[in-house]
Amino acid sequence: MALRQIRLSEDEILRKKSRPVEVVDDKIRQILDDMLDTLQNTENGAAIAAPQVGILKQLVVIATGEDIIKLVNPKIVKKEGEQEVVEGCLSIPNVYGKLKRPKKVTVEALNENGEKITLTGEGFLAKCFCHEIDHLDGILFTDLVTEYIK
């Protein structure tokens, strides 16, 4: 188990675009495992993107309940509907805000074995997909907030 330091909002790495992963190898799988360990060591985190642990690669880990999703080079290929959500972020502790996200999204990515996968998420999972893929483009949820929650 390797815990990585979560980068905070003032870290400029969070504003940079992540690079696609060329080959899904043991090194990439280790980073994904470290990201999962780091996520599971947080108080109430549901997902994490590689830039949040200082790595500019297109990697995302989502842990919702018993489901663990590891994504390499994820791209949103379809959005449906709209929902108002409340979000927070491991990189911006104790800040929460309302924003609009698609109600349903479809994502294409590679899994940790380098196989192409397509996943569709609704509600909370759709929000996670959008939030984490935004991180890969240097976008923080605070860029999209319509109202902060005290």
From Swiss-Prot:
Pfam families on file: Pep_deformylase
Active site: 132
Similarity remark: Belongs to the polypeptide deformylase family.
Protein name from the UniProt record: Peptide deformylase 2
Lineage: superkingdom: Bacteria
Cofactors demanded by this protein: Fe(2+)
Function: Removes the formyl group from the N-terminal Met of newly synthesized proteins. Requires at least a dipeptide for an efficient rate of reaction. N-terminal L-methionine is a prerequisite for activity but the enzyme has broad specificity at other positions.
Its EC number(s): 3.5.1.88
Cofactor note: Binds 1 Fe(2+) ion.
First-level EC class: hydrolase
Biological process according to GO: co-translational protein modification; translation
Organism: Clostridium acetobutylicum (strain ATCC 824 / DSM 792 / JCM 1419 / IAM 19013 / LMG 5710 / NBRC 13948 / NRRL B-527 / VKM B-1787 / 2291 / W)
Keyword field: Hydrolase, Iron, Metal-binding, Protein biosynthesis
GO MF annotations, alphabetized: metal ion binding; peptide deformylase activity
Binding site for Fe cation: 89, 131, 135
Stored InterPro entries: Peptide_deformylase, Peptide_deformylase_sf
Keyword Amino-acid biosynthesis included in the entry's annotation: no
Catalytically driven reaction(s): N-terminal N-formyl-L-methionyl-[peptide] + H2O = N-terminal L-methionyl-[peptide] + formate
